[in-house]
């Protein structure tokens, strides 16, 4: 195993030429390190480095929550983590189907035959051999080697499972940020990985999500006893990490329903619903207006239960 790991590291050193990811793992809890992406859209300049993913040191291996946007990104992340503990990767758990979170999977599958876990829609919507938005947005140098690989296991129901001595709870919540989201909780460490159900420091993109689904998911997350919460995007990992998301979706629901009552119509809703409390957050100008339009379409005929 040692010789194989040395060979992998030598291969990494050679293959990381060209586009360079400058990654630095941050320790967030005992035996948990995360890589935090930029609060930007994916671009040629950032190589898709705009989401968070984490390494958990288990008994004899690393277990990952998401894997990043490219093969080369995953290489760079593993190279940094091998400096902390020289361990293989045994499992990669994906939180949802958006490609900035899982296109690093094939690095871990090829190098370690890691078991890949995630939502069924990921396999249904992305087939081997296809190109995703990252293939279209990023430079060839950054995306080189990145391939879609099938998951080994689909997460369909709430379950607690022990992987290499570490206990994880998988909590599927249905359509929240994406068409089907899962968050992961480590009860022994009191660490929760929310995926994109929680973001902070930036505005979320709700292009495939639901306001009601987000609020439902956030209510479930709030019931868990966590000391650390890792958002899908953002740097706040404290007990207050989800406050921005709760405020945003609560206000969005309230104001959209007021707009419906005022009969603004879809064309006039953005003049009525401005969400100015969030105007200083990253990507507000880019994402807030589409979120308002989508929320109006969702809630136009909503009746409070």
Explain the meaning of each model-derived region:
Residues 61-63, 67-71, 160, 167, ...:
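Metallo-beta-lactamase
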Residues 36-50, 135, 142, 201-210:
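Acidic/histidine-rich helix-loop elements
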Residues 79-156, 160:
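Active-site HxH/HxHxD metal-binding segment of metal-dependent hydrolases
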Residues 30-80, 184-194:
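Conserved beta-strand hairpin/beta-sheet module of binuclear metal-dependent hydrolase folds
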Residues 31, 56, 66, 81, ...:
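Divalent metal-coordination and catalytic microenvironments
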Residues 5-14:
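Sec-dependent N-terminal signal peptides
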Residues 16-20:
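Boundary at the C-terminal end of the N-terminal hydrophobic targeting segment
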Residues 13, 223-225, 236-305:
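Accessory terminal helices/loops
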